[in-house]
Curated annotation (Swiss-Prot):
Keywords: Disulfide bond, Glycoprotein, Knottin, Secreted, Signal. Involved in the regulation of melanogenesis. The binding of ASP to MC1R precludes alpha-MSH initiated signaling and thus blocks production of cAMP, leading to a down-regulation of eumelanogenesis (brown/black pigment) and thus increasing synthesis of pheomelanin (yellow/red pigment). SUPFAM superfamilies: Agouti-related protein (SSF57055). This is Agouti-signaling protein. Residues 1-22 form the signal peptide. It comes from Rattus norvegicus. One of its GO terms (cellular component) is extracellular space.
Length: 131
C-alpha cells in the first residue's frame, strides 16, 4: 500500500510540474539572432509610420472657433429644453440645508428632502440634475 501511495504522489507531482512548465513563457536568448531578425522584419511591415506634425496658428484658431460654435449650440439646445418652473414658496429651504419635517419645502422644485440615519439628518438634495 505504501508503494501505491508513493506512485500516486509521484504522479501528482509530475502532473503539477507539467502544468506549471507548460504555462511558462520561454525567454528568447541573445544567440537566436535569426528569430530576432525575423520578428523585427515582421513588426516593421505590420505598422505604418506615424508622423507628428505641429499645428500652425491658423489651425489652432479654427479648432477654437469650432469648439466655441459647439459650445454655443449646446447652450442653445439646453436653454430650449428648459421649461418654466413654478416659483418657489416664500418660506423655503435652500439646497443642501437642513430640512427636518417641521421645516418648509425645498426652494428648488427638483430637490427633495432626503433623510439619513433614521431621520436624524435631513437635507434638501437634487436627485435628478436634468429635471
Amino acid at each position: 500500500m505504501d508503494v501505491t501511495r508513493l506512485l500516486l504522489a509521484t504522479l501528482v507531482g509530475f502532473l503539477c510540474f507539467l502544468t506549471v512548465h507548460s504555462h511558462l513563457v520561454f525567454e528568447e536568448t541573445l544567440g537566436d539572432d535569426r528569430s530576432l531578425k525575423s520578428n523585427s522584419s515582421i513588426n516593421s511591415l505590420d505598422f505604418s509610420s506615424v508622423s507628428i506634425v505641429a499645428l500652425n496658428k491658423k489651425s489652432k484658431k479654427i479648432s477654437r472657433k469650432e469648439a466655441e460654435k459647439r459650445k454655443r449650440s449646446s447652450k442653445k439646445k439646453a436653454s430650449i429644453k428648459k421649461v418654466a418652473r413654478p416659483p418657489p414658496p416664500s418660506p423655503c429651504v435652500a439646497t443642501r440645508d437642513s430640512c427636518k419635517p417641521p421645516a418648509p419645502a425645498c426652494c428648488n422644485p427638483c430637490a427633495s428632502c432626503q433623510c439619513r440615519f433614521f431621520g436624524s439628518a435631513c437635507t434638501c438634495r437634487v436627485l435628478n440634475p436634468n429635471c
